[in-house]
C-alpha cells in the first residue's frame, strides 16, 4: 500500500512538473510578468475550498501586499495570519516562475483553530473566506491593543481608545469593508430613518438568466412593511406601513460578491444548488448606491472568481480563475492553466435547470480602479 502511495505521489509530481513547464512556455519569457509567480496548491483531502479562496486573495493585489508587508514585521507568535504570510512569502520568493507548493502549515493551523474545518469533508468556500477575513481582522486588532497597552505606539502615552470604544479599522477593513444603509420611510408621515451596517462581502440572491447587476438591483428592491410586519415609527409613535430598502453607502476597495447558489429545499430536507446562468462582467459599476454615497460612480474590474463545480454545497469541487496583468489563469489545486478571457463565460452557469451539475461562479472579487 505504501509503495502504491509513493508511486502515485511520484506520478502526481511528474504531472505537476509537466504542467508547470507547459504554462511557462505558453506565457513565454518575454510576456511573463516580472516578479510574478504562478504556483498551484496541494490538496490535503478536500481542501480545494481553501486553495481556491487563497489563490483568489493572492491575486487581489492590495491584500497580497498587506500580507507580505506583515511578514516583514518583527516575528510574532504563530497564528492563522502568520501562516498565511509565510505561504504568500513562499510563493512570492520562489526561484522558479511556476510550480506547486503544499500549504500544509496553513491547513494544519486552520484545522487546529476551527473544528468546522478539521475534517476531510467538503466545506463552503464562502464560509471559509468569511472566517479568514474576520480572523485576520481580530488578530490585527488584538495586536494593536497589545501594542497600546505596552506603550509602543508612536503617538505617545495617551491611549485614545478605551475598553468600550469601537476598535480602529484594520487593513482588512480598509480593503474589503463597505457600508450599507437601511432606509425605512413611513408611509404616513414620510419620515425617513436610516441605519448603517458594515460588510466585508455582499451575499446576493440569484435568478435564472440574469446578470450580477440585476442581482444587485434586486438586493436593493423596495420592500413594503405591512400587516403584522408594520414598522414602529418614532414620529407617529405607532406601527405604520412603511417602505424599506437597502443601498450601498460606502463602496469598498475590493468588492467581494457571494452568489447565494445553495438553497434549502423542504421537500428534499437538504440544500440543493441553483445552477442558474448569472452573467458577471469584466467591468462593473454599482447603481444601487445611496444619495450620500462617496464616489458613487466608482468603476470595478473583475480580478478573481471562486467557481463551484458540482451539484451541492457538500459535494463537488472548487477552482479559482484569476486575472494577472493582462491574462487569465485557472487554478485547480496543483494545476495551473492559462485561459482566454472568453472562457470565463463557461462559468456563468446553466440556462437549463435540468442539469444541476455545473461549474458556476460562486464568489466574485472586483477591484476598484481608484
Curated annotation (Swiss-Prot):
| Catalytic residue positions | 48, 317
Which InterPro entries does this chain map to?
A: Papain-like_cys_pep_sf, Peptidase_C19, Peptidase_C19_UCH, USP_CS, USP_dom
Segments forming domain USP: 39-369
Task: Identify the keywords attached in UniProt to this record, alphabetized.
Answer: Cell membrane, Cytoplasm, Hydrolase, Membrane, Metal-binding, Nucleus, Protease, Thiol protease, Ubl conjugation pathway, Zinc
- Drop me one GO molecular function for this one: metal ion binding
Give the residues the record marks as binding Zn(2+): 186, 189, 233, 236
Q: Where in the cell is it found?
A: Nucleus; Cytoplasm; Cell membrane
Q: Catalysed reaction per UniProt?
A: Thiol-dependent hydrolysis of ester, thioester, amide, peptide and isopeptide bonds formed by the C-terminal Gly of ubiquitin (a 76-residue protein attached to proteins as an intracellular targeting signal)
Positions of the region Disordered? 146-168
**Which superkingdom?**
Eukaryota
The EC number(s) given in the record are 3.4.19.12
**Mutating residue 48 to S leads to what result?**
Abolishes catalytic activity
Carries keyword S-adenosyl-L-methionine?
Answer: no
> Looking at the keywords, is Cell inner membrane present?
no
Q: What are the GO cellular component annotations?
A: cytoplasm; cytosol; nucleus; plasma membrane
Description of how the protein assembles with itself and partners: Interacts with WDR48. Interacts with WDR20; this interaction promotes translocation of the USP12 complex to the plasma membrane. Component of the USP12-WDR20-WDR48 deubiquitinating complex. Component of the USP12-DMWD-WDR48 deubiquitinating complex. Interacts with PHLPP1. Interacts with RBPJ. Interacts with CBP; this interaction blocks the acetyltransferase activity of CREBBP. Interacts with ITCH; the interaction is more efficient when both USP12 and WDR48/UAF1 are involved and may mediate recruitment of the USP12 deubiquitinating complex to Notch.
Protein purpose: Deubiquitinating enzyme that plays various roles in the regulation of the immune response and inflammation. During TCR engagement and activation, translocates into the cytoplasm and deubiquitinates its substrates LAT and TRAT1 and prevents their lysosome-dependent degradation to stabilize the TCR signaling complex at the plasma membrane. Plays an essential role in the selective LPS-induced macrophage response through the activation of NF-kappa-B pathway. In addition, promotes that antiviral immune response through targeting DNA sensor IFI16 to inhibit its proteasome-dependent degradation.
Its name, as the record gives it, is Ubiquitin carboxyl-terminal hydrolase 12
Higher taxonomy: Eukaryota, Metazoa, Chordata, Craniata, Vertebrata
Amino acid at each position: 500500500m505504501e509503495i502504491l502511495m509513493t508511486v502515485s505521489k511520484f506520478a502526481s509530481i511528474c504531472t505537476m512538473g509537466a504542467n508547470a513547464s507547459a504554462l511557462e512556455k505558453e506565457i513565454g519569457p518575454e510576456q511573463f510578468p516580472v516578479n510574478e509567480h504562478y504556483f498551484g496548491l496541494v490538496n490535503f483531502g478536500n481542501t480545494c475550498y481553501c486553495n481556491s479562496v487563497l489563490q483568489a486573495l493572492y491575486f487581489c493585489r492590495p491584500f497580497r501586499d498587506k500580507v507580505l508587508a506583515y511578514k516583514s514585521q518583527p516575528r510574532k507568535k504563530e497564528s492563522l495570519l502568520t501562516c498565511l504570510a509565510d505561504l504568500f512569502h513562499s510563493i512570492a520568493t520562489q526561484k522558479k516562475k511556476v510550480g506547486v507548493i503544499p500549504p500544509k502549515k496553513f491547513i494544519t493551523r486552520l484545522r487546529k483553530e476551527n473544528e468546522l474545518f478539521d475534517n476531510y469533508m467538503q466545506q463552503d468556500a464562502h464560509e471559509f473566506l468569511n472566517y479568514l477575513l474576520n480572523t485576520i481582522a481580530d488578530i490585527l486588532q488584538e495586536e494593536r491593543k497589545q501594542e497600546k497597552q505596552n506603550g509602543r505606539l508612536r503617538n505617545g502615552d495617551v491611549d485614545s481608545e478605551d475598553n468600550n470604544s469601537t476598535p480602529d479599522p484594520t487593513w482588512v477593513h480598509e480593503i474589503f469593508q463597505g457600508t450599507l444603509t437601511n432606509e425605512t420611510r413611513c408611509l404616513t408621515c414620510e419620515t425617513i430613518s436610516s441605519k448603517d451596517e458594515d460588510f466585508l462581502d455582499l451575499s446576493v440572491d440569484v435568478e435564472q438568466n440574469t446578470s450580477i447587476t440585476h442581482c444587485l438591483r434586486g438586493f436593493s428592491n423596495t420592500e413594503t412593511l405591512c400587516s403584522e410586519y408594520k414598522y414602529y415609527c418614532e414620529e407617529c409613535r405607532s406601527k405604520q406601513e412603511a417602505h424599506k430598502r437597502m443601498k450601498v453607502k460606502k463602496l469598498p476597495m475590493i468588492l467581494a460578491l457571494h452568489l447565494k447558489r445553495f438553497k434549502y429545499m423542504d421537500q428534499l430536507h437538504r440544500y440543493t444548488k441553483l445552477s442558474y446562468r448569472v452573467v458577471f462582467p469584466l467591468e462593473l459599476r454599482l447603481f444601487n448606491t445611496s444619495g450620500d454615497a462617496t464616489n458613487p460612480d466608482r468603476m470595478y474590474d473583475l480580478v478573481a472568481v471562486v467557481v463551484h463545480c458540482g451539484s451541492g454545497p457538500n459535494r463537488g469541487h472548487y477552482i479559482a480563475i484569476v486575472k494577472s496583468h493582462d491574462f487569465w489563469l485557472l487554478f485547480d489545486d496543483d494545476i495551473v492553466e492559462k485561459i482566454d478571457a472568453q472562457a470565463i463565460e463557461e462559468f456563468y452557469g446553466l440556462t437549463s435547470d435540468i442539469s444541476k451539475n455545473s461549474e458556476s461562479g460562486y464568489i466574485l472579487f472586483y477591484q476598484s480602479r481608484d
